[in-house]
């Protein structure tokens, strides 16, 4: 059974969902899971929102204006989510996969680097600043939380979005950090192009061989709606 669970992962496509119900659902999933619960990946876009990580400082939220600021329990500082950005949450039993937190972070960064390479974009990670960069510009943010040996939260990859709200914050706590996105580097690329590559690259790097793809929606309490 353990061998089968190590191979299996459920990939859920949420489309556009408000941040708070999805965050609640991640917490509920993690609190309720046991050693027989398959790992999951959640793909989602969020309406415009700033999320402040556990290490977040108020001075890095410069001019939020009409965009809400929501406290999150992920690692890191403030970032922005909006339509056209692919958020991928990774809900993984690290003990079962024999993965350390640093190994998971590296796998996520390498997933994004490999995905971008598929579109002829040369990207890299930085030891001093988590995430993925093209030159000096940041293209992907990441932040995780570990509970009961299981991960939740994940990455946010800029694909084809309005980047201007990033000017209202110091992204991830870095004043003057410039952001970029896939569609500025390779015109015409969409989430539909990048999302399958992102998921498949992650599955290959972490070693899942039996993905199951399920569309899913949530109610306002963060519970699954029937198909």
Curated annotation (Swiss-Prot):
It is found in: Cytoplasm. Residues 35-210 form the BPL/LPL catalytic domain. The keyword Cytoplasm applies. GO terms for biological process: protein modification process. It catalyses: octanoyl-[ACP] + L-lysyl-[protein] = N(6)-octanoyl-L-lysyl-[protein] + holo-[ACP] + H(+). The record marks 138 as: Lowers pKa of active site Cys. Its EC number is 2.3.1.181. GO terms for cellular component: cytoplasm. CDD domains: LipB. The active site is at residue 172. The keyword Ribonucleoprotein does not apply. Substrate binds at residues 74-81, 141-143, 154-156. Disulfide bonds: none annotated. It is an enzyme of class 2 (transferase). It comes from the Bacteria. Keywords: Acyltransferase, Cytoplasm, Transferase. Pathway: Protein modification; protein lipoylation via endogenous pathway; protein N(6)-(lipoyl)lysine from octanoyl-[acyl-carrier-protein]: step 1/2. One of its GO terms (molecular function) is lipoyl(octanoyl) transferase activity. Belongs to the LipB family. In the reaction, the free carboxyl group of octanoic acid is attached via an amide linkage to the epsilon-amino group of a specific lysine residue of lipoyl domains of lipoate-dependent enzymes. Catalyzes the transfer of endogenously produced octanoic acid from octanoyl-acyl-carrier-protein onto the lipoyl domains of lipoate-dependent enzymes. Lipoyl-ACP can also act as a substrate although octanoyl-ACP is likely to be the physiological substrate. This is Octanoyltransferase. It comes from Pectobacterium atrosepticum (strain SCRI 1043 / ATCC BAA-672) (Erwinia carotovora subsp. atroseptica).
């Amino acid at each position: 059974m353990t061998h089968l669970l190590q191979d299996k992962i459920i990939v859920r496509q949420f489309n556009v969902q408000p941040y708070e119900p999805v965050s609640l659902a991640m917490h509920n999933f993690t609190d309720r899971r046991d050693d027989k619960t398959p790992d999951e990946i959640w793909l989602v876009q969020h309406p415009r929102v700033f999320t402040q990580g556990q290490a977040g400082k108020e001075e890095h939220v410069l001019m939020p204006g009409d965009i809400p600021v929501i406290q999150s329990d992920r690692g890191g500082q403030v970032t922005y989510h909006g339509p056209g950005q692919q958020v991928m949450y990774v809900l993984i039993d690290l003990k079962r996969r024999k993965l350390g937190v640093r190994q998971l972070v590296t796998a996520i960064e390498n997933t994004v680097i490999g995905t971008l390479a598929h579109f002829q974009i040369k990207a890299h990670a930085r030891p001093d600043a988590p995430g993925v960069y093209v030159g000096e510009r940041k293209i992907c943010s990441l932040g995780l939380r570990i509970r009961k040996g299981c991960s939740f939260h994940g990455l946010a990859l800029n694909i084809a979005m309005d980047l201007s709200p990033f000017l209202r914050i110091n992204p991830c706590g870095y004043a003057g950090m410039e952001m970029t996105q896939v569609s500025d580097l390779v015109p015409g690329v969409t989430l539909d192009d990048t999302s399958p590559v992102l998921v498949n690259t992650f599955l290959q790097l972490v070693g899942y061989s039996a993905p199951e793809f399920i569309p899913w929606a949530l109610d306002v309490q963060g519970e699954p709606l029937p198909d």
